[in-house]
């Protein structure tokens, strides 16, 4: 109920009026930037055991954009969240709340989470959701070739951190990318390469910096084709089975 009232209030007031705070820390553009530095509400939330029941209520606000299923939007405006590691979710929400990751659309909603415990609760609920299988993929006429090109690039540079099936690494804060929307992946990698995602991992920036736009398209096409065994939602009744 609390989340529903907050959502109504935000939408009726106009979320554009709730601008993000000025950055409290320098991001990757600063010489003293340290990725995933300890401290603050992020570290507090990571030490807490999330309660999925309470997290379900907290997620009501998030569901307005990311959908109740956590599927986000295939056009990439809102990422697929379901099944994401709690560590990644907590870090990204804390970074947005602190002004380290610039996201004016997300900030008013992230700001409704009242304390580190609620961050942990929401993350626990989201992580437990199955990953939808009908996410946005690359659909160009050259899809097969692009996916093949992306697979080769991914296995050379991305697999070590993000895993064979896109499972990421919970302990190292590397995100699950299986089931993520192609357009979201492409946008994030482009922003990381070009220095516009201020909370980016410097190690990833070094890897991705030399890639051309065409190569990023190929990698994103392949990444969006990945599925994570045991974590994906079951196909809807009546849906055609994949061969």
Predicted regions and their residues:
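N-terminal export/targeting leaders of redox proteins
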Residues: 1-45, 94, 98, 225-243
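Conserved long hydrophobic alpha-helices within structured protein cores
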Residues: 27-28, 121, 181-184
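Gly/Gly-Pro-rich "capping" loops immediately C-terminal to redox-active cysteine motifs
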Residues: 52, 63, 67-101, 107-112, ...
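Generic hydrophobic secondary-structure packing signal
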Residues: 14, 51, 106, 118-119, ...
């Amino acid at each position: 109920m609390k989340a529903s009232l907050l959502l109504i209030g935000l939408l009726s007031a106009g979320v554009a009026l709730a601008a993000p705070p000025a950055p409290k820390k320098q991001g990757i553009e600063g010489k003293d930037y340290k990725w995933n530095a300890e401290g603050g509400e992020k570290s507090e939330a990571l030490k807490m055991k999330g309660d999925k029941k309470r997290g379900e209520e907290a997620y009501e606000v998030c569901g307005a954009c990311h959908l109740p299923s956590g599927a986000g939007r295939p056009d990439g405006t809102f990422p697929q969240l379901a099944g994401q590691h709690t560590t990644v979710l907590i870090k990204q929400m804390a970074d947005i709340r602190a002004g380290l990751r610039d996201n004016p659309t997300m900030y008013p909603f992230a700001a409704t989470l009242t304390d580190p415990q609620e961050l942990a609760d929401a993350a626990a609920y989201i992580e437990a959701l199955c990953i939808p299988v009908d996410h946005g993929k690359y659909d160009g006429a050259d899809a097969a070739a692009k996916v093949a090109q992306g697979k080769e690039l991914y296995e050379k540079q991305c697999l070590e951190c993000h895993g064979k099936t896109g499972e990421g690494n919970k302990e190292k804060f590397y995100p699950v990318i299986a089931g993520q929307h192609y357009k979201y992946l492409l946008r994030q990698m482009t922003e990381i390469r070009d220095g516009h995602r201020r909370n980016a991992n410097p190690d990833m920036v070094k890897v991705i910096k030399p890639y051309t736009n065409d190569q990023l398209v190929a990698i994103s096409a392949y990444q969006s084709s990945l599925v994570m065994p045991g974590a994906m939602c079951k196909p809807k009744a009546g849906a055609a089975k994949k061969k």
